[in-house]
Amino acid sequence: MLKRSSWLATLLGLLTVASVSTIVYAIELDEATRTVPLESSGRTVVLTPEQVKRGKRLFNNSCAICHNGGITKTNPNVGLDPESLGLATPQRDNIEALVDYMKDPTSYDGAESIAELHPSIKSAEIFPKMRNLTDEDLFTIAGHILLQPKIVSEKWGGGKIYY
């Protein structure tokens, strides 16, 4: 009985400490870091800390299975790094262009639709993880993609040497 009581007291003590302790899981990103390209004309947008968190969560739940670390598992020559996004046709290096891609993806050269092969809103019946994503969700995912090179630099889209 004494062992059980001391075990319960220890457990309650740990739970009490855990409930009153403040644990920081992420770094605070300044406004300059959270500023990403909005459209091809050069306009930018500052992501809120909430959008940053939500974008990361949605990316990890919906995209990371194939794009973990900014790579593309099915085509290691094309990643989500700024250079690859900028060389795509049309360029996919801003939020509006990435949202457009997530709605109706095209090949890297822009010549044909790949909606039946790549998860998208257009092919949500085939790829269920895309079914419930709103335009705001797509916005935050795109923001996450564009923010990562500022946080992890060349690791984002860097491939096997980093992940």
Swiss-Prot record:
Cofactor note (record): Binds 1 heme c group covalently per subunit.
Subcellular location: Plastid, Chloroplast thylakoid membrane
Signal peptide region: 1-26
Keyword Chloroplast: yes
GO terms assigned for molecular function: electron transfer activity; heme binding; iron ion binding
UniProt binding sites for heme c: C63, C66, H67, H118
UniProt KW Plastid keyword: yes
Mode of membrane association: Peripheral membrane protein
GO BP terms, alphabetized: photosynthesis, light reaction; respiratory electron transport chain
PROSITE patterns listed in its UniProt record: CYTC (PS51007)
Cofactor(s) needed: heme c
Keywords on record: Chloroplast, Electron transport, Heme, Iron, Membrane, Metal-binding, Photosynthesis, Photosystem II, Plastid, Signal, Thylakoid, Transport
Quaternary data: PSII is composed of 1 copy each of membrane proteins PsbA, PsbB, PsbC, PsbD, PsbE, PsbF, PsbH, PsbI, PsbJ, PsbK, PsbL, PsbM, PsbT, PsbY, PsbZ, Psb30/Ycf12, at least 3 peripheral proteins of the oxygen-evolving complex and a large number of cofactors. It forms dimeric complexes. The extrinsic subunits in red algae are PsbO (OEC33), PsbQ', cytochrome c-550 and PsbU.
Assigned protein family: Belongs to the cytochrome c family. PsbV subfamily.
HAMAP family in alphabetical order: PSII_Cyt550
UniProt name for this protein: Photosystem II extrinsic protein V
Organism of provenance: Porphyra purpurea (Red seaweed)
Gene designation per UniProt: psbV
